[in-house]
């Protein structure tokens, strides 16, 4: 995240870490904010004519939701009037270049949703809240596709289990 702080990409990346999809981020405006509450009710999508338009719902009607975002992020959206105004594909291109420059394993912008689900789970947030914030309607999808383990958290869990298994 430090690499995008202060850039035009910061808001979009941070919202990605809140579990938002790229199209949802690109459709967000300050009108979607009520203090720290961000309503996710639309998405920027490409049409069959290869034009980008705002669709009046996110990926699914079950994806409509309101999430709480931090003060600084809310203030940025309020000040700028939007979350990301440029072409949605630029988020993917920027991330690809950033990952390559940093020499870290490649990942997609959409993978930030998995980061959100995994981090929230590792913090002990119940699945019902993770699902509500990420716009998932099925624990099956959440568990099968999005939740992953973090090596440090897994190591902590293994040490805890090991301590209980000692004679």
PLM-predicted stretches and their roles:
Residues 158-166:
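Short, basic, alpha-helical segments at the C-terminal edge of helix-turn-helix-like DNA-binding modules
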